[in-house]
Amino acid sequence: MRVARFCTVVAILLYFGFHIAECDINFSLAGADGQTYNTFIAKLRQELSIGTQKVANITVLKHHVSSNTQRFLSINLFNYNGDKITLGIDVFDVYVVGFLTGTNSYIFKEAPDLAYNKSLLFPGSVRENLSYTGGYDDLERRGAGREDIPLGLLPLDTAITNLFRRDSTSFRRSFIVIIQMVSEAARFKIIEAKIAKNLYGENTFKPDQAIISLENNWGALSKQIQKAQDRGGVFPNLVTLTTSSGKPLIIRNDSDPLVQNGIALLKYMSERSVEYSITDDTVNESNGAFLEIMEIHDLM
């Protein structure tokens, strides 16, 4: 696995107002396994976390940048043959806004306005605007649902290959794989752990209702965790998730093990008054915590 070593320095310089070329984060399937995948996700979180703040000891993503050039991160994904695609990631929410293959770039419908600026994202490429968004509703509308699409090394290889070859008939399915294995894994440590556990050989797994429930409720969890800071950590509104066995799982406060050990990133929500703590430039992981969440809540 290849991860750009200079990205942290670049991000720090950008934070202090130096305008330099954006850095890339790389992940290659050649030699990839659970450990290299964890390193990749940790690096992505580290870049997203620089210059941010924390609530309930969880990183809250940025909601403004000092320069438009800092709005997107580039992530290079390589398949087993070494073919490369580049994802454009919005640092505000970890959404994939588009991708680049060769000299051709594609941007999702309803992406942030800055994503359509060719000088900011994939400069010099031949641009095509897709007719659908990167949301699951649109991606699943003409293809299989998340519960029917396997995740793993081989599905990721197929997804990268389809995008590299510009096979538009497979774009939606390919992005369902990529978004979960990149964006959702960055947001949720518990999803990262589930994926990493299954990254060996030809092994795959299909997301169950517990994982899909987490993905669908990231915004709600982000909002309640931040609003709870004025209420002693108690959520103003309960968040109801679903366990793997189909039982409702109610999250009431920010001390819940799932919140403290399962969530890595929060989307910034403005409807609150919160006291922040400044984050450092490192991201600590705990495999033991992952197992604790799985055991306590039966999510996996």
Curated annotation (Swiss-Prot):
Gene3D superfamilies: Ricin (A subunit), domain 1, Ricin (A Subunit), domain 2. Belongs to the ribosome-inactivating protein family. Type 1 RIP subfamily. Its EC number is 3.2.2.22. Glycans are attached at residues 26, 57, 117, 129, 253, 284. This is Ribosome-inactivating protein gynostemmin. PROSITE patterns: SHIGA_RICIN. InterPro entries: Ribosome-inact_prot_sf (IPR036041), Ribosome_inactivat_1/2 (IPR017989), Ribosome_inactivat_prot (IPR001574), Ribosome_inactivat_prot_CS (IPR017988), Ribosome_inactivat_prot_sub1 (IPR016138), Ribosome_inactivat_prot_sub2 (IPR016139). Ribosome-inactivating protein of type 1, inhibits protein synthesis in animal cells. It is an enzyme of class 3 (hydrolase). One of its GO terms (biological process) is negative regulation of translation. Residues 1-23 form the signal peptide. One of its GO terms (molecular function) is rRNA N-glycosylase activity.
